[in-house]
């Protein structure tokens, strides 16, 4: 998912997206360990999506802190 699409989501939706991505990563790692993973590059994609979501969440936290000061 692109960062532009993620920025359009609300904070609650981002938290939900983060949870679903972490769950997907867990399942992919499990499939990798059992030798059932069809697309190993998907792990990399999911890890990067998790990083994107975390970055956007952090950007919003920093923006809120600046407004409060």
UniProtKB/Swiss-Prot annotation:
Keywords: Ribonucleoprotein, Ribosomal protein. Signal peptide: none annotated. The keyword Transcription does not apply. GO terms for cellular component: cytosolic large ribosomal subunit. Pfam families: Ribosomal_L29. GO terms for biological process: translation. InterPro entries: Ribosomal_protein_uL29, Ribosomal_uL29, Ribosomal_uL29_CS, Ribosomal_uL29_sf. One of its GO terms (molecular function) is structural constituent of ribosome. Belongs to the universal ribosomal protein uL29 family. This is Large ribosomal subunit protein uL29. It comes from Carboxydothermus hydrogenoformans (strain ATCC BAA-161 / DSM 6008 / Z-2901).
